[in-house]
Amino acid sequence: MSKKIAVIGECMIELSEKGADVKRGFGGDTLNTSVYIARQVDPAALTVHYVTALGTDSFSQQMLDAWHGENVDTSLTQRMENRLPGLYYIETDSTGERTFYYWRNEAAAKFWLESEQSAAICEELANFDYLYLSGISLAILSPTSREKLLSLLRECRANGGKVIFDNNYRPRLWASKEETQQVYQQMLECTDIAFLTLDDEDALWGQQPVEDVIARTHNAGVKEVVVKRGADSCLVSIAGEGLVDVPAVKLPKEKVIDTTAAGDSFSAGYLAVRLTGGSAEDAAKRGHLTASTVIQYRGAIIPREAMPA
């Protein structure tokens, strides 16, 4: 029987500059991960569900249609009257450096745990095999909704499910660093697999040797710690099994076009192998291969035919 993973988060409308024109698309860290998992697994082994809230507008419908086309199940995505998806604009300067502007205060995704349907959705999610979320999934919620989400994660684990967390830290989405540290600590205490980006760890906790970062994460109760280091090797530490160092795929500089979804796609490649019975080392190799392919194309979601075999 197929196992089920629910990816929880927010997808936004993306506006980006293309010469003198503005191009419209959509994006979000967890959505990127869900699409790249779905592209790399047999649905008979693992089905991918995306959990968020959207409006009843045409932009929201276009998002849903696109996700269906990627074999991402949206049966647990809510549609909310009088709400819209969030929006962000990417401005690119003459050197290629990007600046992001966000409009998300009233985005539907912030309120997915406050609706009448949320209790029934949580009841269903508590029986999934895997729940995946990121720091952004937590950041956009009210403190009350965050507590509901943490309760759901604990219930899922009590039912035999596993929780997967990516530490994606965006300071502007949080009231303070202290608040984030407190929430992340609670999150790690109910996490089975943690994906850590060192830049985010350093920004939140202060710069520490990677060994200390891994030890702190294990001490919080996380069994499997995956440290993503961009173009450098990835480190995987499984409690009681030691450290695995897996080299990245090296690309010539001119091949690197856009690193927007590098981390999201690495996590997807890793999970596509790991959650279907593969070893941590093979999972990390697939993560590197996926990320190294994605960064050779512009935009977060690359053409399906460009995916590695």
Curated annotation (Swiss-Prot):
Q: Name the chain's protein.
A: 2-dehydro-3-deoxygluconokinase
Gene Ontology BP, a term: D-glucuronate catabolic process
Kindly give the Pfam families that the UniProt entry links to this protein.
Answer: PfkB
Q: Which family does it belong to?
A: Belongs to the carbohydrate kinase PfkB family.
Indicate which residues the UniProt annotation says bind substrate.
Answer: 28-32, 88, 102-104, 170, 264
What gene is this protein a product of? kdgK
What is the top-level taxon of the source organism?
A: Bacteria
User: Is Protein biosynthesis given among the entry's keywords?
Assistant: no
